[in-house]
Amino acid sequence: MALNFANNNSLSAISSLPASISGGGMTLISEQTASSSSTISFTSGIDSTYDEYVFKFYDIHPATDDQPFKFQADTGTNTSYNQTMTTTRFKAGQNEAGSYNVLGYETGSDQAQGSGFQTLTQNIGNANDESCAGQIQLFQPSSSVFVKHFIARFQSTQHSEQSYDDFTAGYFNTTTPLTRFQFKFNSGTIESGVIKLYGIS
């Protein structure tokens, strides 16, 4: 078996890769900026081009205090955003005073064949410096054979001055390709923030 080597002796200064080695990478597909938006929807750019897509979220800030951030998906040109999913969630958190910390399963914000919007974060505050940031990985959304798996991780500033690290994962229980995704807070608008969609090669 032939071995391929990088064309440089220093790993800190690799100038090129052999032609047979693929560099891979993230391709920015689209970007949306919230401005008192009731929802943010991505309705194009998700197809069979990539096996994996990633949504990245930057300082998503609610207009209304004490609100969790959520998402759902749909197929074709449908806009009901009510796909059936089964999910799991857990959290780690601590307050600013250091007097409270928690690690545990999030009973009540998971779904077992539910069709509601899936919770991704704790209840985020609307003070000027409070927001959430994170990402969602989506695997083979265009498959017509398998269910659609996702993994999400978010860091948020909870409304009572607590830091939370939220882990959410699951699958959309459909073999129909998913083509669109929608994001929103449980109540009120997304006052500000940026969401970017990437394709992973």
Regions found by a protein language model. Give the residues of each.
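Surface-exposed molecular-recognition determinants
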Residues: 2-201
